[in-house]
From Swiss-Prot:
Homohexamer or homotetramer. Interacts with SRCIN1. Interacts with VAMP2; the interaction is inhibited by interaction of VAPM2 with SEPT8. Residues 1-25, 131-137, 224-313 are cytoplasmic. GO terms for biological process: endocytosis; negative regulation of exocytosis; regulation of neuronal synaptic plasticity; regulation of opioid receptor signaling pathway. The calcium-binding activity is thought to be localized in the cytoplasmic tail of the protein. The keyword Cytoplasm does not apply. The lineage of its organism: Eukaryota, Metazoa, Chordata, Craniata, Vertebrata. This is Synaptophysin. Keywords: Calcium, Cytoplasmic vesicle, Glycoprotein, Membrane, Phosphoprotein, Repeat, Synapse, Synaptosome, Transmembrane, Transmembrane helix, Ubl conjugation.
Length: 313
């Protein structure tokens, strides 16, 4: 019954959660950050390596042909030692050189906190979306935290890359042999048998810089949620209004409607010039070619001039 109740609670949370945010860049990048942070601290924090060398003395009874030296995270190599024959008496403790714990632990610490923050931010995106966007405080805090983690990834990855290079130098059997006094005595022979495998540590550095890329890239997506980019995002200019043509495109004062237009209604209308009337007979008071026609009243002759040529004659 308790298991069923827990399942109901989980189902309610899933039903109320906005899992679509995982498909968006903001949530999807957080998933990648969460996964890559796991790989970063796992490949570094769980490392353990081993190197092997041999010391062949002139006195064969004093030789040691299989010397194993183990070391691990956090790489306090100055505390790692092995017993090497002196070819003359009792074996002697020889310590490795260097303490590279600071860069390694710093890298792992940043990775762990980035993992925790990514998990918490992702849960906030899914189940507390309204609280996240309330008063725009959530996106602003998220942006600041993302910027801090991006900077921390840059510093920690660079420091750990340098630290790893020093670890490789300090655990190289050839360099260890160079520091052993017994190997420089005549008749003694020292050989390296196996180098430590550091491919896992190389992978941790790669994941460190991949996390840097993810966190820097995520700054843009979080920045858009803050609303700070709104003043810089100008709306595209609207389409310019169409200017009316002269005379309203043959509408108001153009073809066929205005008092000075060129339409068929005014060109040959009653206010025009020569207007013969073929339908009525010529008379003294009508139209046509008579004395009171268009030449007299509305024709080309001015008002007050003789209305017919016969009167002038």
């Amino acid at each position: 019954m308790l298991l069923l109740a827990d399942m109901d609670v989980v189902n309610q949370l899933v039903a109320g959660g906005q899992f679509r945010v995982v498909k968006e860049p903001l949530g999807f990048v957080k998933v990648l950050q969460w996964v890559f942070a796991i790989f970063a601290f796992a490949t570094c924090g769980s490392y353990s390596g081993e190197l092997q060398l041999s010391v062949d003395c002139a006195n064969k009874t004093k030789s040691d042909l299989n010397i194993e030296v183990e070391f691990e995270y956090p790489f306090r190599l100055h505390e790692v030692y092995f017993e090497a024959p002196t070819c003359q008496g009792d074996p002697k403790k020889i310590f490795l050189v260097g303490n590279y714990s600071s860069s390694a632990e710093f890298f792992v610490t940043v990775a762990v906190f980035a993992f925790l923050y990514s998990m918490g931010a992702l849960a906030t995106y899914i189940f507390l979306q309204n609280k996240y966007r309330e008063n725009n405080k959530g996106p602003m805090l998220d942006f600041l935290a993302t910027a801090v983690f991006a900077f921390m990834w840059l510093v920690s990855s660079s420091a750990w890359a340098k630290g790893l290079s020093d670890v490789k130098m300090a655990t190289d059997p050839e360099n260890i042999i160079k520091g052993m006094h017994v190997c420089h005595q005549p008749g003694n022979t020292c050989k390296e048998l196996r180098d430590p495998v550091t491919s896992g540590l190389n992978t941790s550095v790669v994941f460190g810089f991949l996390n840097l890329v993810l966190w820097v890239g995520n700054l843009w997506f979080v920045f858009k949620e803050t609303g700070w980019a709104a003043p810089f995002l100008r709306a595209p200019p609207g389409a310019p209004e169409k200017q009316p043509a002269p005379g309203d495109a043959y509408g108001q004062a153009g073809y066929g409607q205005g008092p000075g237009g060129y339409g068929p209604q005014d060109s040959y209308g009653p206010q025009g010039g020569y207007q013969p009337d073929y339908g009525q007979p010529a008379s003294s008071g009508g139209g046509g070619y008579g004395p009171q026609g268009d030449y007299g009243q509305q024709g080309y002759g001015p008002q007050g001039a003789p209305t017919s040529f016969s009167n002038q004659m």
